[in-house]
Amino acid sequence: DELGFKTYWVTYHDSVKRSGHLFAEMRGGKGKKIVMIGHLDTVFEVDHPFQKYIRKGNKAFGPGIADMKSGDVSMIYAMKALDHVGALKNMDITLAFIGDEEKLGAHSSIVRKELIEAGKWADIGFGFEGAGGMNSGTIARRSASSWILKTTGIQGHSSRVFSESLGYGAIFESSRILNAFREELAEEQYLTFNPGAIVGGTDIEYDPLNARGNAYGKTNVVSQSVVVHGGIRTISMDQLDNAMNSMKKIVSNNLPGTTASIEFKTSYPPMEPTQANYDLLDQLEDINKALGYGVLKPLDPSMRGAADISFVAPHVDAALAGMGPDGHGAHSEDEWLDLSTLPKTTSRAAILIYRLTR
């Protein structure tokens, strides 16, 4: 507010079970329209023992200090720098501080509506999580989707397993499918898929929201039911569509006496590696070199998970993530920030935004 931004909270009904978001808007009308993305939440619960800030030289330890309190600070101080030289008031900028980045939940169309609208308004998108140092930038991030595979078999005495009347059972069918996924798709670049939980037997229960289940079975009874819950990541929507079609085809080729089905749910779309993103990284590299920080190379997308920049990237002309300071040990009690990188990422972001808005 002190810088002249219009700030407001976006909140949701209790039934959504997700935190709200803080937005700040500057509408000066000059140059490219910019949206900058941070997040306020961490993975650490209120009662988690890791709750202290400790500084050791240029290392600062604390919950969420790298992921991503420091990125939020870098965003704010880049705005302060632009205000200091009298440039901020003329710019079109939206700052989005998301409240539930670490666990999106089941209502992405609801809780990312405002962020997507900001992306449609903007020309350029920036994500302020770190990229692992001052010499790498993020021009792409993979998607995050989930899948649930269900197989069924004919329950009966195991002495007749593989017979024409009884067939192979649900567990053999799920094993066939998972192995076929591996054989046909595992070598494709930027495509990863992982079965994270499996429950199978005569009688099963599975809770997909909490990834927990129970199973009952006997060694002399052919299994009747299996549920497999997994994830899939891709570099583009085309790759995701192709992978889903391949997986569906594998699932449909059932062993005798079995049935199978698979369902997919996309949580985060991919941030695809467009030429415009590479060009924007080149502009940032020019600044990096001019400030004495060295070369800036694109980070391998397979090294990154999903992030909120992916909701903005399809709608803007160009996007970069990894704009924030360098830290390590995210999501652990060893999480720390390299304090020396905080002023560096702040200054180069301010200069890039200044140039984009001339």
Describe each model-derived feature in a short phrase.
Residues Y8, V35, D92-A96, N194, ...:
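A structural signal for isolated positions on well-ordered beta-strands in alpha/beta enzyme cores
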Residues S15, G130-G133, I139, S146-R358:
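Metal-dependent amide/peptide-bond hydrolase catalytic core
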Residues H39-V43, P49, R142-S145, I198-G201:
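Short glycine-enriched loops at secondary-structure junctions
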Residues K33-V35, A60, W121-G127, S146-I148, ...:
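Short glycine-aspartate micro-motif
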Residues K56-D67, V295-L299, S332-E333:
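Short pre-catalytic strand/loop immediately N-terminal to key active-site residues, enriched for Gly-Thr
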Residues D1-P63, D83-N90, D286:
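Acidic/His- and Gly-rich active-site-bordering loop/insert found
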Residues W9-T11, F97, T266:
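Residue-level recognition of beta-strand->loop/alpha-helix junctions
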Residues M68-A144, G200-N210, T357:
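Acidic/histidine-rich catalytic neighborhood of metal-dependent amide-processing enzymes
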